[in-house]
Amino acid sequence: MTLLNPYFGEFGGQFVPQILIPALRQLEEAFVSAQKDPEFQAEFTDLLKNYAGRPTALTLCKNLTAGTKTKLYLKREDLLHGGAHKTNQVLGQALLAKRMGKSEIIAETGAGQHGVATALACALLGLKCRVYMGAKDVERQSPNVFRMRLMGAEVIPVHSGSSTLKDACNEALRDWSGSYETAHYLLGTAAGPHPYPTIVREFQRMIGEETKAQILEKEGRLPDAVLACVGGGSNAIGMFADFIDDTHVRLIGIEPGGLGIESGQHGAPLKHGRVGIYFGMKSPMMQTSDGQIEESYSISAGLDFPSVGPQHAYLNSIGRADYVSITDDEALDAFKALCRGEGIIPALESSHALAHALKMIKAEPEKEQLLVVNLSGRGDKDIFTVHDILKDRGEI
């Protein structure tokens, strides 16, 4: 029996080997206890404020919307210590690990941002850290690999399968199956077996809470829409959670359209996948005709994931949130627009959300609308990828 509901509608659950059930139960009990413990909450809040740098700014983009009637704000998770929203929930889970008496942390990472956040939290709190990362991602995210190693983490390249995030997830789970007595698996997104989707949402929900307070202070009303990119879905659910009951606020999640949905080279399981069991949960995923997990693709390593968190699947199924896709080229155009228009270098992941916001503005320039994009991370890690693409195009 679980203490919290393991499902969001029909999605979610706890589909793991029996050997891991006690570890998941211990984690759930520790989380429920910690949520009621003023000392834990005070320590978490202190770390978020004085170590990570919360609250993050809400920045008005004046140049990108020039000549239109839209007001576009960015929630600046890129300004957080570590460079992305990942730091929020990593600090929470690392504190939970200490609470459970664990001495080691296992993590998976795609773009490397979760790995960096995990490495910094482990260095801060005195925990051993090993991070599984697809061999392809190790190559395309070398700055983050070095950052992790600088902070004492062991980075383990995964060469199996497609050598990307899904394979890193599999290896991390395999490791945890043999080490759960001393190690905590610090999952990096709002997916996986219960209670992870709930824990990650709660440790990210300050994104939406701060956004709501800030936009009310600046504009005196709630936004017409909040937008966030969706891979596994943690930055998006962190933004959406506090707005779910505000039914007049549109929640828009942006999946990676890759080379175009029709090409098959994408990472958009919510709109173009089928429900199945993967990574310990029931959720939409990219599958072949015979039910095997299909390779996902995105220019952004952090969105290159063949499934999606179960709460997003539920919000999609009941029509509370809308999910769309943005191609690599559209994301790259938005990346360049923000660099040149506002002097902000965004992560390629976040650029997907920005691209859809810019589409909305272009489609109705005379419409008075108030939009907030969760700028989930900064683009330092992506500059070499973007450089190579722009060089091939002759743009630099």
UniProtKB/Swiss-Prot annotation:
It catalyses: (1S,2R)-1-C-(indol-3-yl)glycerol 3-phosphate + L-serine = D-glyceraldehyde 3-phosphate + L-tryptophan + H2O. Gene3D superfamilies: 3.40.50.1100. Keywords: Amino-acid biosynthesis, Aromatic amino acid biosynthesis, Lyase, Pyridoxal phosphate, Tryptophan biosynthesis. Its EC number is 4.2.1.20. GO terms for molecular function: tryptophan synthase activity. Pathway: Amino-acid biosynthesis; L-tryptophan biosynthesis; L-tryptophan from chorismate: step 5/5. CDD domains: Trp-synth_B (cd06446). Signal peptide: none annotated. Transmembrane segments: none annotated. The keyword Lyase applies. Its cofactor is pyridoxal 5'-phosphate. The modification N6-(pyridoxal phosphate)lysine is found at K86. The keyword Amino-acid biosynthesis applies. One of its GO terms (cellular component) is cytoplasm. The beta subunit is responsible for the synthesis of L-tryptophan from indole and L-serine. Tetramer of two alpha and two beta chains. Belongs to the TrpB family. PANTHER family: TRYPTOPHAN SYNTHASE, TRYPTOPHAN SYNTHASE-RELATED. This is Tryptophan synthase beta chain. It comes from Pectobacterium atrosepticum (strain SCRI 1043 / ATCC BAA-672) (Erwinia carotovora subsp. atroseptica).
